[in-house]
Amino acid sequence: MTSSAPVGVFDSGLGGISVVRQIRTDLPHERILYFGDSANAPYGTKTPEQVRDLSFRIVEDFVEQGAKAVVIACNTATSSAVQELREHYDIPIIGMEPALKVACDRGHGERQSVIVAATPLTLRERKFAALMHRFEDAHTIHKQPCPRLVEIVERGELDDHDLVMRTLHDYFDQYDLAHTDSVVLGCTHFVFYRDYFRELLPNNVAIVDGNEGTARHLEVVLESLGKLAPEEQDGGVILRNSDPGERIAELAQQLLER
């Protein structure tokens, strides 16, 4: 497999396009195949077995298209499927997890109060429980499932300011935000809400996501294998979705260019 081969990126729907944008910024010569599984969204309310089955189908398709690596741009699919995918395929499988370590490290040893916003399944899975166990003794960590934030993106309602702010208040008004240090956006869909979160949260509260770290991890892995795209290659993105409707295709393109 050559360095000019594409990178496959997938998500339960449209949220992973936020990761594609980061990869395109950091690795502009890479060719990216994006698959959004909007016909089966959301993953966050499915069983781990269902998510694993869907993930294997998608990765198998990427392999058939000659992908040199796959990025699971979905915290939920990472939690449910990444280990088995790595055992089954001989190409790099890059996963994601909520950037809890980044949020806790911001305190430089001081106790941090952190809210992790994610899908219900991500927060229930053993992978997140193990991650949380590493930090919960030294920090105050709140888990906040936010399934409606996924639905708003998938319905194309991201620009409905009143709806979004009302939804955020429903989820976060229960917290003492003035004494919160960070909110972790533990779902790639949620990165599209960054400006809304900034409006909701006091200025001292950091908003943390895992997209930069994921793109950086991909770069390190490809470089170690000698598989970074050649600089003379024109990068690009091909968007595909399990929902064949024109509306989804238009929405995906809008999010890519947002």
Curated annotation (Swiss-Prot):
Record keyword Nucleotide-binding present: no
NCBIfam families named among the record's database cross-references: glut_race
GO annotation (BP), single: cell wall organization
Top enzyme category: isomerase
Active site, per annotation: C74 (proton donor/acceptor), C187 (proton donor/acceptor)
GO MF annotation, one: glutamate racemase activity
Organism: Bifidobacterium animalis subsp. lactis (strain AD011)
Annotated TM spans: none
UniProt keywords, alphabetically: Cell shape, Cell wall biogenesis/degradation, Isomerase, Peptidoglycan synthesis
InterPro entries: Asp/Glu/hydantoin_racemase, Asp/Glu_race, Asp/Glu_racemase_AS_1, Glu_race
Function: Provides the (R)-glutamate required for cell wall biosynthesis.
EC number(s) recorded for this UniProt protein: 5.1.1.3
Lineage top rank: taxon: Bacteria
Residues given in the record as substrate binding sites: D11, S12, Y43, G44, N75, T76, T188, H189
Pfam families, per database record: Asp_Glu_race
Catalysed reactions, as listed in the record: L-glutamate = D-glutamate
Assigned protein family: Belongs to the aspartate/glutamate racemases family.
Protein name: Glutamate racemase
Stretches of the chain forming a coiled coil according to its record: none
Keyword Ribonucleoprotein part of the UniProt annotation: no
